[in-house]
């Protein structure tokens, strides 16, 4: 990987939780390619995790942000403008839902959790994109993360699947809005990875095994796989790509049924 690919570029990473996060894989790939990074966090508990990781990548810009609060989002970008005069890329790796409502039936989703899930997991990308646009006068790239549960029904995903479907639609509309200004907007649909967010999904080990046995590549992806694909979408290598949902899932999304050589899996 060329360490000059992202030289001179500055990017904001939102949603880093720990060194198992997909956001960490993306941040590492961008940093290794020469990018200068800033990070946001929500709450003191996450600051204790994010700050040391930011320092590993040579960043001292770690700023608070509650994406559910419009004033907090504005304050984040005001603080970022005090440090940088421009922003070249944005990574939105944020989603949340009450894990108790991811089990059982989608039809039993409460109104409160539905609204909260859509606000944090979907609208937040639009909110931060609106602020980031102002720091991209010469164009840039925005990226969010989604999952195959937006396209097909997946176990224990429920309202998050609905939210990710809305997020994918948002990517297309944002791409249209911002394209005339040279700003590209894309998504990565990553296969299942053991992350903090995944811990709220029931039978996740079963999902991992199923994906491994039935994907064309016969393996699960990892954060480095996603990081390298994100680097492509965030760099000038993808200068003609916008409104795209790139699947990084070992090809699982093309499969129509269980592979003939896949062993049976018992739920644990």
Question: Where do the PLM segments sit?
Answer:
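A conserved structural motif in NAD(P)-dependent oxidoreductases
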Residues: 215-226, 237
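Canonical Rossmann dinucleotide-binding motif of NAD(H)/NADP(H)-dependent dehydrogenases/reductases
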Residues: 3-39
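Conserved mid-core segment of classical short-chain dehydrogenase/reductases
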Residues: 54, 65-74, 78-83, 92-115, ...
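Short, flexible catalytic-loop segment of classical short-chain dehydrogenase/reductase
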Residues: 185, 189-200, 248, 254
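Short, small/polar-rich loop/turn modules that mediate ligand/substrate recognition or access, typified
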Residues: 179, 184, 241-243
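A short hydrophobic alpha-helix cap/turn motif
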Residues: 31, 85, 136-137, 176-181, ...
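Short C-terminal tail/terminal secondary-structure segment
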Residues: 231, 242-268
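Catalytic loop of short-chain dehydrogenase/reductase
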Residues: 15-24, 95-130, 134, 138-180, ...
């Amino acid at each position: 990987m060329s360490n000059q690919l992202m030289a001179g570029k500055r990017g904001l990473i939102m949603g880093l939780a720990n060194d198992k996060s997909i956001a960490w894989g993306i941040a590492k790939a961008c940093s290794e390619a020469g990018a200068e990074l800033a990070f946001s966090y929500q709450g003191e508990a996450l600051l204790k995790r994010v700050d040391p990781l930011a320092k590993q990548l040579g960043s001292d810009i770690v700023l608070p942000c509650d994406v559910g609060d419009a004033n907090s989002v504005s304050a984040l970008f005001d603080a970022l403008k005090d440090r940088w005069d421009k922003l070249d890329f944005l990574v939105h790796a944020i989603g949340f839902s009450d894990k108790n409502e991811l089990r059982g039936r989608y039809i039993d989703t409460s109104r409160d959790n539905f609204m909260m899930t859509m606000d944090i997991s979907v609208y937040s990308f639009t909110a931060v994109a609106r602020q980031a646009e102002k720091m991209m006068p010469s164009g840039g790239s925005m990226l969010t993360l989604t999952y195959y549960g937006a396209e097909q029904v997946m176990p224990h995903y429920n309202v998050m699947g609905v939210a990710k479907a809305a997020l994918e639609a948002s990517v297309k509309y944002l791409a249209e809005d911002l394209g005339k200004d040279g700003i590209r907007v894309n998504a990565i649909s990553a296969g299942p990875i053991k992350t903090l967010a995944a811990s709220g999904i029931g039978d996740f080990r079963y999902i991992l095994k199923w994906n491994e046995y039935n994907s064309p590549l016969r393996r699960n992806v990892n954060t480095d796989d996603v990081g390298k694909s994100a680097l492509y979408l965030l760099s000038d290598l993808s200068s003609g790509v916008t409104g795209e949902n790139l699947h990084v899932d070992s090809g699982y999304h093309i499969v129509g049924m269980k592979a003939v050589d896949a062993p049976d899996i018992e739920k644990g």
